Amino acid sequence: MVNIPKSHPRYWSLYYREKIIEGMEKGMTAKAGLIAHGRGEAFDYLIGERTIEPAERAMRAAVAKFLLAEHPVISVNGNVAALVPKETIELAKALNAKLEINLFYRTEERVRTIAEELRKYDPEIEILGINPTKRIPGLEHERGKVDENGIWKADVVLVPLEDGDRTEALVRMGKFVVTVDLNPLSRSARMADITIVDNIVRAYPRMVELAREMKDYSREELLKIVGEYDNGKTLSDVLLHIRDRLTRLAEEGIWRRKELE
């Protein structure tokens, strides 16, 4: 990976960009994953590169739903494995959820490489999706394959950085679907039951914190959080945040105000 000086004003953005490139070079991330990352980065600019209140609200509801679930599953793709492998394992443990590798551009080599990356952080972790035997109805070819003991039987599924038709297909199967997507206009964002509009590198650590904080909540408290959540309002609030932020920036001006030395 390219050595980026920490003094660089865009250090973290460049760092995670390099992680995605490294993921592709290792064989985990598909070429299309780089395009998807760039699109997400553009929306991160728009929201201000921070966790906004609608995302925090969505994360609390998502964690509550997972803590209530009987068969929770977290899906892992190439971008997730490249960006947050350690945090993915921490989140699965905090939510008592299973991990399943589920890929749009599936090859056995990619699956094996992603599993190896995850096991660097926990050699004993159970990873599903290695030999899937079931298929999501309506999804053809490799990308429709799921594990019988994972997504196939899950009641609640977290599908971060996911494509819209698979999100929709899971909802049609009766799954409660949570997604992490920086684009509030994407089909995944609009199809999911809970949409966390945040960068996954911020969202997963925060969800781990919330899971540890909320694990002792009563069932009634968790049900109340889920019951009061409105995903339509969350997405609308994200769009309003972007609108208001852009309006404020336009009014204040974004051009440099002084001569450079």
From Swiss-Prot:
This is 4-phosphopantoate--beta-alanine ligase. Activity is not affected by 4'-phosphopantothenate or CoA/acetyl-CoA. Its EC number is 6.3.2.36. Activity increases with temperature elevation from 65 degrees Celsius to 95 degrees Celsius. Keywords: ATP-binding, Coenzyme A biosynthesis, Ligase, Nucleotide-binding. Disruption phenotype: Only viable in the presence of CoA or 4'-phosphopantothenate. ATP binds at R17, R39, D181, L182, N183, R187, S188, N199, I200. One of its GO terms (molecular function) is ATP binding. InterPro entries: PPS/PS (IPR002855), PPS/PS_sf (IPR038138). Pfam families: PPS_PS. Changing Y45 to A/F: Strong decrease in activity. Catalyzes the condensation of (R)-4-phosphopantoate and beta-alanine to 4'-phosphopantothenate in the CoA biosynthesis pathway. Cannot use (R)-pantoate as substrate and thus does not display pantothenate synthetase (PS) activity. Displays strict specificity for its natural substrates, 4-phosphopantoate, ATP and beta-alanine. It comes from Thermococcus kodakarensis (strain ATCC BAA-918 / JCM 12380 / KOD1). GO terms for biological process: coenzyme A biosynthetic process. Belongs to the archaeal phosphopantothenate synthetase family. Pathway: Cofactor biosynthesis; coenzyme A biosynthesis. PANTHER family: 4-PHOSPHOPANTOATE--BETA-ALANINE LIGASE. It catalyses: (R)-4-phosphopantoate + beta-alanine + ATP = (R)-4'-phosphopantothenate + AMP + diphosphate + H(+). HAMAP family: PPS (MF_02224). Optimum pH is 6.5.
